[in-house]
Amino acid sequence: MIRNVIIGLLAVAVIATGYWGFQEQQQSQILTVQAENGYQRAFHELAYHIDQIEDQLGATMAMNTRRQLTPSLAEVWRLTSLASEEIGQLPLGIVDLSKTEEFLHHLGTFSYKTSIRDLDKEPLTDEEYEKLEKFHDYSKTIKNDLRKTQAMTLKKDMRWLDLNKEFQAQDEPLDNAIVDGFRTMDEHVKGASEVEWGPGMVIRNDHEKKLEKRLEKRKITEEEAKEIALSYVDMEQATDVIVSETGDGLDMYSVIIDDPERQAHYYLDMTQQGGHPIWFLQERQINEQNISLNEASNKAQEFLEEHDKENMQLVDSKQYDSIGVFEFVYLEDNVRVYPDTIKVEVALDEGDIIGYEAMSYLVNHHDRDLEEPELTADEARERLNPRLEVMEDHIALIQNDLGEEVLCYEFFGVINDETYRIYINAEDGEEEKVEKMQEAEPVYDFD
């Protein structure tokens, strides 16, 4: 009898274990499909919005009245913002798109500042029309390069997650149609950096110029750069560490570390002034998930504290296959300081830090004298759409469209099952920014 009971219990345990394994595998497949869907959506929407930018710029050059020019330039600015966001959503850390991003920044700044100007009193100058023509020419180049890359990916049925795996497994420079297409695009738009865009439209990357002003004067040595890099990747010593100086732009050290024990490579850039790591990436095979997203977020927080990044609050977390991506902002007197942002990636198989990006934090972090808000949270809430069901609120410092820091109330709310983040100016009650929060891509099962 006891024997039968034991056999029965073992059978139930085996079935339960099998069911749990099936559930885990199914959940992993769902996350994988969601991640791939997100990448595909961002890529094709990027191509679509670049198309629209080129068309809108072409139409703008033919206009001659403020009634048409102002909304047209505002639309260019809106599309440019969308395109920049979509580039940021793609897993392109292995490709340098700095020139393309710089071009979009210049175009966005020009179109925004021009659209809010009284064009009846201060019409576009001949010089500004020349800039529009150059913007149009470069946007056409980007559009054509993107279309070629898009056609190639559709023809070969290429997947973005395969690109990530290919990158992790590579020993030589990655040879991939997607990567080659984006490299070609960035190479073609390099000429845009040689154009003098006028006041406020600097050739050097704005972030790099601001960062250079904030950094300590003393430059570290290559040996010091090596020691700092090893501490960030949690290694005391390595058999092979290559430190080299970067070329144009901000003076930086690029560090490559070989870790035979983990079968991994590390890539890291840091400033020569002060030795501040800007980003690093660990390249290795990521295996099945062993730790939860919550455990990974704690490891990311501990990593920041170990490297003197105190008072950082987790504001967003996402999971892509077996990788957790976490966004932290600096917290000052209970105010979320969004310009001071750091992103950390954690491998969910071993719980180690595999990615770090701190450019925004390094550029913007400084001592601030935050003023008390003029409005209360309840007064700010009255400025919201009455149909919005508010779920949570915070006090936050953000950058407006002109790059100015503004103290706001941050509200998360729902309308018709859609989640929004809305910023209300804490001084005058104006609506500073409205963002629709991203949702997980749907997974369709036709089996």
Curated annotation (Swiss-Prot):
Organism encoding this protein: Halalkalibacterium halodurans (strain ATCC BAA-125 / DSM 18197 / FERM 7344 / JCM 9153 / C-125) (Bacillus halodurans)
Protein name from the UniProt record: Sporulation protein YpeB
Top-level taxonomic group: Bacteria
Q: What family is this protein classified in?
A: Belongs to the YpeB family.
GO BP: spore germination; sporulation resulting in formation of a cellular spore
Q: Name one Pfam family in it.
A: PepSY
Keywords of the record: Germination, Sporulation
Q: Which InterPro entries match?
A: PepSY, YpeB_N, YpeB_PepSY1-2
What's this protein's function?
Answer: Required for spore cortex hydrolysis during germination. Appears to be required for either expression, localization, activation or function of SleB.
